[in-house]
Amino acid sequence: MYGSARTITNLEGSPSRSPRLPRSPRLGHRRTSSGGGGGTGKTLSMENIQSLNAAYATSGPMYLSDHEGVASTTYPKGTMTLGRATNRAVYGGRVTAMGSSPNIASAGLSHTDVLSYTDQHGGLTGSSHHHHHQVPSMLRQVRDSTMLDLQAQLKELQRENDLLRKELDIKDSKLGSSMNSIKTFWSPELKKERVLRKEEAARMSVLKEQMRVSHEENQHLQLTIQALQDELRTQRDLNHLLQQESGNRGAEHFTIELTEENFRRLQAEHDRQAKELFLLRKTLEEMELRIETQKQTLNARDESIKKLLEMLQSKGLPSKSLEDDNERTRRMAEAESQVSHLEVILDQKEKENIHLREELHRRSQLQPEPAKTKALQTVIEMKDTKIASLERNIRDLEDEIQMLKANGVLNTEDREEEIKQIEVYKSHSKFMKTKIDQLKQELSKKESELLALQTKLETLSNQNSDCKQHIEVLKESLTAKEQRAAILQTEVDALRLRLEEKESFLNKKTKQLQDLTEEKGTLAGEIRDMKDMLEVKERKINVLQKKIENLQEQLRDKDKQLTNLKDRVKSLQTDSSNTDTALATLEEALSEKERIIERLKEQRERDDRERLEEIESFRKENKDLKEKVNALQAELTEKESSLIDLKEHASSLASAGLKRDSKLKSLEIAIEQKKEECSKLEAQLKKAHNIEDDSRMNPEFADQIKQLDKEASYYRDECGKAQAEVDRLLEILKEVENEKNDKDKKIAELESLTLRHMKDQNKKVANLKHNQQLEKKKNAQLLEEVRRREDSMADNSQHLQIEELMNALEKTRQELDATKARLASTQQSLAEKEAHLANLRIERRKQLEEILEMKQEALLAAISEKDANIALLELSASKKKKTQEEVMALKREKDRLVHQLKQQTQNRMKLMADNYDDDHHHYHHHHHHHHHRSPGRSQHSNHRPSPDQDDEEGIWA
């Protein structure tokens, strides 16, 4: 009817109990002990008054620390698993010492899931076994943290054992005092006290058994710690062997996979935490509504308790003069009506309490109880204990009323016994008055304490609302940072893909460059062979020209002889006086001379034919050489176009490098912001620690401090991961810049080769011009000789040969004009290519200047960040070694960055000076372009930025 046992069992069903562990064996004992205090005596016993006094004197709420569990909870030996726990570590339960009476139910200790923290860390170790050969340091840290947590839990269990022993001693002393008081004052209650002693002995045995179980559990935890240490040793040995086997084969690939897996795992944990936070918000709102309803019910209960106390005071004290039976019956009727009304109210309140406890139990199974509900639950339990004591008093009064009715209506003879009992009441009324006064004083104290607690509750609720708002702001910032981290991760993935594409494109270009160099070598060999062929042909032409000159001299001699002979013939004709013999001799001589002339003519015709054949062969060879020269020029144009494409690709790579530098800057700025937020969170943690020192009795601040610690550690991990990702991207950029420098060197080599090739072509063209001029001179001499011979020779064959020679000369002139036009076109294309090269160099200088400016800006930003961090650490005014070491490390990094900034400024000044010299040289080069074309090109092409500048590109802070 009164439901005292139900309230206790609902309290004992601890909402924070782990689902893996069994229920505590103390529950059955509490069920048996809660119903053992039924009202059997006729009057309000002295033992009940003393128990009420002890309860109100010692029933203040006691809070354990955040990680302290109660040692009376029992676990079987095989229930400790190392899987991932779903529940968090529960805050410490409330302990209430309720005096020596078993009639007042003591509230149950909340079951704390001691192994949830070890389960959580065990799950971490289980997940880290999969990548143990990849991340040994992470696994060691996790294992060390689990070992430290287990040792801390062992220490806490030992401390709780000591506390339980102290409680046992206190209960023994209270039992002894209560027994002495019973023996001295109330001998009729000895039988009842024997039963109570038996129950207390049973409780003592249960407590001893629980101590034994906790001791066994401590031993079991020590064994598990030893097993974990053995596992650590074996895993370290395995890790050492795997590291020796794997070596340095795929370190970068593993780190990339690890970071991606860590990122995915962190993302999954973040989603899970977001869901839990959403559920927690909903449950917090519902709990606040429940707390308001409970406050209203508590106010109603306070009023009912005050009424009951007034009734007890009016009922407990008998009047000095005996009144009539009518007045007594009227008082009994009023008391019965009040009791019935109070019973109805109590039933309603108990139903509401049961409903609230069930909802609290259901909510607390989903999440750990907040500190506010714990404080309210302690207040509710105190009120329940008061209500239970008042119920017992009411039952005693009802029994007394029934006895009075029976004695008053049936037995008039027993009035004398009642009068004796009233005298006994009178004798002990003074004692009861003093006790009631003490109870009133204690009630006033408790009311003042309740008011103080209400003010504390209001302040704590205000602080809780502020903390909730701050937590919501932090959560919003967390979501924004996570979104930014996701965006940065997508950008990093896109950069990786683009880097891979650029690397493949660079490999293709290197292959093309190698093919071009090989083709260039083959073409150079062919050109050398052509040069040798040309030299051989020139030697043959020289030999033939010498032969022609010798034949021409012979012809001249023969012409002279002919003229002499003609003169002689004329002289002979004039001398008609010569004899016929002389004429015969002369005719013979003439015939011989004619034969000689015919032979000479035949020999001349043969020589002319041979010369014409050689000229035709030379023409054919000249055509072949021109075709080869045209093919070489086409290949040269193709190679120059490929060079232009390579330069455009190099400029695109430089622009991509600039974009990557800008993205790296944004990443560094994001990292700086995260570091600043971490420093802010650390400052908030320090403030929270100071608040915790001021109010250690409030567990809500401890929860918030823990959450802030977790958030700070999470931000530190995120900062470390982002810093590692930035370092990896910087290394990739370094490699890309080195590859770009190699490509620039290859382009310079190709430019020098093209310049040499163009010089060789210019030399060949000059030699061809010289040879053509010599051929022109020789042809002019031949034409003059032919014209001279035209006067002496009238043969048609000679005229035909002269016409052929004239046609050949015209053809050679046309070929010379064509070669001149080609030379002009090649010179024009060379000038255009030089202008394009100059533009490319100017663009490259601009890009280098922009890169140096960006590096200087990034270094200045990094230096300002280091200054800000140093100022924050100095303002924190903490003289710890870690902060001093951090300040020293930041100063060293700042000095290194300043040194890098000096180097960058020196490089920029060098580049500006080189640009000035190059512009000055370029002006002189254009001024003497027509006179000194090839050396100007060589000097211009050799001017490139030093490789030190290329090596010093990038910020590796």
From Swiss-Prot:
The lineage of its organism: Eukaryota, Metazoa, Chordata, Craniata, Vertebrata. The keyword Methyltransferase does not apply. GO terms for molecular function: structural constituent of presynaptic active zone. One of its GO terms (biological process) is regulation of calcium-dependent activation of synaptic vesicle fusion. Pfam families: Cast (PF10174). Residues 1-44, 918-957 are annotated as: Disordered. Residues 948-957 have a biased composition (Acidic residues). InterPro entries: ELKS/CAST. Keywords: Cell projection, Coiled coil, Cytoplasm, Cytoskeleton, Phosphoprotein, Synapse. This is ERC protein 2. PANTHER family: ELKS/RAB6-INTERACTING/CAST PROTEIN (PTHR18861), ERC PROTEIN 2 (PTHR18861:SF3).
